[in-house]
Amino acid sequence: FDITHHLKFVKALHRPYRPGRTFDAQRVDYLVLNYDTLIESSLALGNFPYADGLEGGTVAWWNPETFQRAGLSARVLKLHGSIDWSEFPDEVFPRRVPTTVGGMDENRQIMIWPASTKYRETQRDPYSQLSNIAREILRPLHDSQRVLVICGYSFSDSHINIEIESALRETAGRLTIVVFYPEDELLGQLKAWHEDDVIR
């Protein structure tokens, strides 16, 4: 994969330096629905410390405490899983095992594929843990603001749309969404939110 654009993207988010101005770095939370590892790879290539819920290195085990570590530039929440996650017999939580590691015939990838059962699958761990963290992210404290930047999302996952809409309704204007949208006019879910006086 060519990660040139992803690397430029994360550098722009994490290093928005301007001559003569200092930058007070704040952690960026990535709520990722794609299965690839382009964001994680870009963060690593950019030397940005991040947590994705897995402890270890190339081979890793699930440990959500990694999200609470000090000094993180980013947290990456893979809400639908990842191409490098594997589930083993008698284990509830995923491990990161690259395809280059042999002798693991029993491992299998665990991702939430597009299907009518997608919502039900998100209620199991580790997805339910990731969803709970995402809910907290989307609900800033009363004395703060949050911006959710959405790129490459088609708004076709109803369980994701419900979470975004609930957060917009519950935060009384403290959550702003910025959507990179390919159409000239708003359609579907975005149009409904834009026309809703409580949300807008």
Model-derived regions, located:
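Phosphate/oxyanion-binding active-site loops and adjacent basic polyanion-contact surfaces
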Residues: 1-9, 119-130, 153-160
